[in-house]
Structure formats: structure tokens, C-alpha cells
């Protein structure tokens, strides 16, 4: 049974839940603020399909020979690029799959701002899949749905965190030529409960229900992305993402899932065909492509990935992978689990989660001093490059 995997190892990818033929596994085991798979012993038939599907217990993927190959990339569709978190690459890949008559599986917000994966061939759902969502996504039974349409001969593009890509691979148990796997560059994942708690705090602060949320609004530019929350009474919360209370917990690594600190799927071990994310450092390493509207890093890990990328309408330029790794170290290494995380969760046992968020994630004087120093350096750089003043 899947109980061979501890909560310290489990990525909550959902492969075991999808693999169980009698639906004996559900996300009912609570550890800290995450929900983990739990087996109903009264239903379990001990077939061990959950173990066979588990990416923690299974073989890890690796790039094809001659890969990975890296690119700086962006969409030429400027409205879609501005709507995206970085360079609009996911939109272009998903749009290509729709033009091929296929399906796309990716993460969306539902009407209560829970993050979940859906499988769809509708353009409006692709738009919902765009934008970063910094919370654990519930894949539900999407892996089963993906397998069903693959077996019918349909094409599918699956997008998710490396652990979710690995989970789908091991659930399927074989390669499908009609499946394109796209992993996101991943720092780690906070829980749905953490996000819902933060949303509740903000709704009380602004006195109305949340109607729209963007973690990476680019109204002030890609390099000045902000968390934007719109409420039913017309009020708006907009704050630089590096200052936002929720994102403070994320960036410090305090609110991440336990397995993220020893992730087994970094260094291209998920088995993805493509890896996508922000091309941080672009203003230094490739300034002629950086217009502050968003630029993506695309890393190709397979021949299938190359063929699909070549058919998409993505503007790209081959780029040194070492320069991507310099500013995206989470591609190779996990975040260190520091003492503050233990202190935070110990505090939640004495008080509630809201009080812990307020206490731990407000900007300190030292952090403010560091921020102002970084702003000074950025101001000097932008001035020398003639790019104008950064906003923060």
C-alpha cells in the first residue's frame, strides 16, 4: 500500500488516488496545513496499484540524449503576453494543442479560489489556466481523464509542477506519443488552506467577497509584478509581490509543502518534454529581448518537445542554460528548510493560522533595509541602461 511513503516524502501529486480501482484513497490525512492521501482499510483490496503509480517509489525521468536545450522565448500576441505571468509561452503551447484538435490539462481557480486541475479543449478554459497560482492544486481524477482521451487517440498537453508531471507519467505507466508534458519551474508549493486563510483575512479587511485574484499582475511591468485582488465592493488590493504577506511566506520557504525541501523531481527528473518559467536576469543577459512585458525561459528535454515547440508561434532564441540556472536555482536545488518554518508551525499550535501569518510575514526593519538597498542597485542599473526608474 501507499503508506510506504511518509508525509515528508509525499508530493500530493494524486497518482495513487487516480490509480486505485476501488477509490479507497482520499485526501483526508491532515499534516500541518496540507491534506495527504489516506487509505480506507475497509475498502482497500491490496492490489498495490497505488504503489506502482507513485512517482516517489518509481523510476525518475531524464532528458533525451543531447538535451536539455534552452531558449529565451515569448509570445508575439502582446495582449496574451501581458495577461500571462512571464512571456506567454504556456498560452502559445496550449493554443497550438487546441489547433491540433487536442486537449489541455492545467490548473485553474474555481469560483471559491481553490486551485484545481481540469482537462479541456475550450479556449476560455485555457485563459483560466494562465497566470501563476501559488497554492497546491487538486488534480482530482484528471489523470484518469487524460488517460481516457489519450487511449481514444486524442492529443493532450499536460501542464503542472514537476511532481504532478512525474505523477501522471507513473500513473500512465507507458509513453504516449500523443502526450506533451510541460513542467513549470517550481520553487515549492503552499497549501490550499494557507491561501484560503489569507483570502479570508483580505475579505474581512476590505469588507467584501473576492472576485478576482492575480499573483503576477504586470500593469507596472514584468519586473514590478504585483499581487492584485479585486473585491465585490470595487475595492482593490495591489501590492508588490515581494512585499505581499502571503508571498512573504512563500519566498521565505516557510509555507512550502514538506516534500518540497527534498524534491525528487528537480534537475529535469520529472520526465517532462518542456520546462517553462520566468527568464529572470533577462535585463542583464539578453536586454534586447527584454521589454519588461515578460520573457520566458523554455528548456527542451526531448525530441517530442522540440517538434512541438517548432510548430508553435513562439519567438525564441537559443540561450545558455547556465544563465537560466543562475537565476532559477530551484531548477536544480531545493529550498533549505530553516528554523523559521518550525517556529511558524509551532506558533500555529498555540494560536491560529491567521495570527501566525500576521506575526511572521510582516516586513521587518532588516528586510525593509535590504529592499531599499536592492532598489538602489536596480535604480542605478536601470539608469545606466536608459530604461527609466523601477517602481520598487
Label each residue range with its predicted role:
Residues 1-7, 38-42, 242-251:
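Short, intrinsically disordered, charge-biased short linear motifs at domain edges
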Residues 2-3, 9, 15-38, 48-66, ...:
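Iron-sulfur cluster-binding cysteine motifs and their immediate structural context
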Residues 42-152, 326-341, 346, 350-356:
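Flanking helices and flexible, charged tails adjoining ferredoxin-like Fe-S electron-transfer domains
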Residues 85-88, 111, 158-168, 188-190:
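Gly/Ser/Thr-rich loops at beta-strand to alpha-helix junctions
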Residues 180-201:
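Short, flexible loop segments at boundaries between secondary-structure elements
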Residues 8-23, 45-57, 161-167, 256-268:
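Local cysteine-cluster metal-coordination motifs and their immediate loop/turn environment
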Residues 169-180, 199-204:
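Short, surface-exposed basic-aromatic patches at helix termini and helix-loop junctions that form
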Residues 100-103, 203, 208-392:
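Long, compositionally biased charged/polar accessory segments in the mid-to-C-terminal portions
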